[in-house]
Design a protein with these regions (language model features):
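Short coil/turn motif common to extracellular beta-sandwich-like domains
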Residues: 72-75, 247-250, 369-376
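C-terminal soluble interaction/assembly domains
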Residues: 274-299, 304-307, 314-317
Length: 441
């Protein structure tokens, strides 16, 4: 249901800050010279409601039609998320100016990368710096130069009819009109030369190379387009975990795609480093920490000729546990494709730790009980903690779900109706469960 939920607005971005970024001379006056941009597109019905389609006819920036914004005549920072259902955006400015990319999905690059165009695929994030110094009283447009996209890249197609037809297909269009005003006090007017020293993963330290495939399959039911796009020759099954990854494993994932279409591949749990795309090292803007990588469509092909598959390799360290109850996922970040089954699951196991703790009892108490405000949880064994907490009512209906909860200030249950409830705790180390009953009065 991802396409439907994103269409209706359940999608956005989170800004994560740290001491290294805070020490840099970067714009950070939120809404003045530090501006988040969520890019998407929508189709409107005759009653001006969103319709659920892969491509909309109208560009929306921060959910605004024909968006414009006033920025100061200095260096301006845009934190950009491609939140579209499917479309990629070939970003550039109407006057051809350069802009500097300073982050990829997972954080700062070693140094700003100056470009005039950048293709941002579904789910990807970048931050850019644009120098507007000395330009007060002028204006410029941030545009999508999608007429330049290949026909097998989302947004580069030109469908005249059918479910994928849309006004913006294979066209250039405005994303944001910028009116440049006066410079602010304490303005940033220069772009730093260096940002951080990333320590990337070394392929020589990889424990394994996992080989994944992307392919097309025709004739499957409930598929909107002519092809179903599938991972590892199967559609998603929520009860099946494809891989068991040992905790702290460093792994190379090698994805070979015979699909005619390009797919932004996303993995949960980790940030990774791209090793190569079709044998070529990543560009400087892609050489940092990533969690989305574009897998190009195959090249060539035709009657009797399958074409040449594309091959993308990345390396990641899996340092966070995930059991079969809460597996991590990997999928195409085009929502329609993942909804139709282009997705898989994996667990990250720590067998030794689980075996050592398997017979450890979970002794826990709840207080005050009854309660009408907050419920506090105390583990008798100080080495134990909560991995997951679920609260259900007497009919078995889930009322509260708390992954890795902070318990110091208690759990707010004031919104629950009076009655009896069951609280189930999954212990963090052993992954064993215990259930306690409490009363809301």
């Amino acid at each position: 249901m991802t396409e439907e939920q994103i269409t209706k607005g359940i999608g956005g971005l989170i800004i994560v800050r740290d001491s290294i970024e805070s020490a840099l001379a970067l714009p950070r006056s939120y809404g003045v010279d530090d501006i988040p941009l969520v890019l998407t597109d929508r189709d409107f019905s005759t009653s001006n409601q969103f319709t659920m389609v892969p491509y909309g006819d109208s560009m929306l920036t921060n959910m605004t039609l024909r968006a414009q914004y006033q920025v100061p005549a200095q260096v301006v920072r845009f934190r950009i998320l491609n939140g579209a259902i499917e479309r990629s955006y070939n970003l550039g400015f109407s006057d051809g100016r350069s802009f500097s990319i300073i982050t990829s999905d997972g954080g700062l690059l070693n140094a700003p990368v100056s470009v005039t165009k950048y293709i941002l695929h579904a789910g990807e994030r970048i931050e850019i710096l644009v120098n507007c110094s000395g330009q007060s009283g002028t204006s410029v447009d941030l545009k999508a130069y999608n007429s330049l996209l290949a026909g097998n890249v989302a947004g580069g197609e030109n469908f005249n009819n059918g479910p994928f037809a849309n006004y913006l297909g294979k066209k250039d269009f405005n994303i944001l009109h910028l009116n440049i005003g006066a410079q602010t006090a304490n303005a940033i007017t220069t772009i730093p030369k260096t940002l951080i020293t990333n320590i990337l993963l070394n392929s020589a330290n990889a424990n394994i190379t996992r080989k994944l495939t992307i392919s097309d399959s025709a004739g499957l039911p409930n598929i909107q387009g002519p092809n179903a796009f599938i991972l590892n020759h199967k559609l998603f099954n929520i009860n099946y975990n494809e891989y068991q990854v040992p905790l702290n494993n460093t792994e190379i994932w090698e994805i070979t795609s015979s699909s005619a279409f390009g797919h932004p591949f996303h993995i949960h749990d980790v940030e990774f480093n791209i090793i190569s795309v079709n044998g070529v090292a990543p560009t400087a803007a892609q050489a940092g920490w990533k969690d989305v990588v574009f897998i190009p469509g195959k090249t060539g092909g035709g009657p009797g000729n399958p074409g040449t598959p594309s091959v993308v390799k990345f390396i990641a360290k899996f340092d966070d546990y995930a059991d079969a109850l809460h597996p991590f996922m990997y999928h195409c970040h085009i929502s329609l494709h993942e909804d139709e089954g282009m997705m898989g699951q994996f667990v990250v196991t720590n067998q030794n730790a689980v075996a050592d703790l398997k017979n450890t009892d979970i002794l826990v108490s709840l207080y005050p009980n009854p309660t009408n405000n907050k419920l506090y949880i105390e583990f008798k064994n100080q080495n134990q903690s909560a991995y997951y907490i679920t609260i259900t009512d007497v009919l078995g209906r889930t009322k509260v779900m708390l992954p890795k909860p902070e318990l110091l200030n208690g759990i707010d249950v004031s919104h629950l109706s009076k009655g009896i409830y069951h609280l189930t705790i999954i212990e963090n180390n052993s992954k064993q469960t215990t259930t306690k009953t409490f009363v809301v009065n």
